[in-house]
Structures are given as C-alpha cells and as structure tokens.
C-alpha cells in the first residue's frame, strides 16, 4: 500500500540567443536554473521536487521559493565540474560506474561533438573497468591512466590493456 509517484524529467526552457546562459528547467510549474550540468539532472531535479511536494502534502512547511532557491544553489564537486588549468579547459567527473560513465559520455557528445577528448583517468579496483572504458572512449580520444592515491586503485597497465581492446 505504498504510494507511487511517477516522475517525468523537467523540461528545459529554450531561449534563443546566448548559448552560454544557464539553462532554465520547469517542473510542476516551478522554474529554476539548472545548477548541475548534464541532461540526467533534469530527472534528478524532478525527483527532488516530487519528493519535496510529497512532504508539502504531508504538512511540511517547505515553500516553492525555498525549493527553487535550493535547486539554484546546489553544487556537486567532481560531477561534471568545469575548470581551467594552464589555459586548458578541464571537466572533472568521478564517473565510477557504467551508468555514470554513460551520463558523462552523453554530456561530452552534446557539448563537444566530434572533438577528440583527452582523458586523465584512474579507476578503483572494485569497479567495472571494461564497462566504464567501453562507455566513455571513442575513436581518436587520448587516454592517460593514473593510480588513485589513497585508494585500492586499478593497475594503470591493466586498464591500458583493456582500453586497447576497445574499438
């Protein structure tokens, strides 16, 4: 007898003109800036709103303004985090499984279509190395493998052997 809420992704409001503006999302009448990058965040933010609306229905005092403010200020370091280093654009992402790698690759394909990507990557020993590498790597990409300090890291040479089998 548990209630079920089916959540559809938030809709991106398309604004013609400056492509560098932060996208605005709309879900259940709430308009809010997409603070986290990636199309998958349309689903994640909609789930957060749906959860908060259930709490509102149960009497919690959470205003729509507070929801919008919270969504506009959310940060997730290491998840599609843009930066600069010595004049080079960086994208830092801790994609640690195939689903996260799929979201990362979708963002890369949308943001940098047809551009070769230089990857600096390390993986934990316990992760699906072949699944992650097969998901993110494309023909023409460059891969630099490193151990992850302070963790049980996969051997970079073993990862390189896997990467060499990917078409």
List each language-model region with its residue ranges:
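Conserved beta-strand termini and adjacent loop/short-helix elements that scaffold enzyme active sites
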Residues: 7-9, 83, 146
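Nucleotide phosphate-binding/pyrophosphate-handling subdomain across enzymes
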Residues: 28-142
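C-terminal helical cap/extension that packs against the catalytic core
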Residues: 1, 15-24, 89-91, 98, ...
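Internal gly/pro-rich beta-alpha loop/helix module
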Residues: 1-43
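Residue-level detector of flexible, active-site-proximal loop/helix-junction positions
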Residues: 4, 11-13, 78, 87, ...
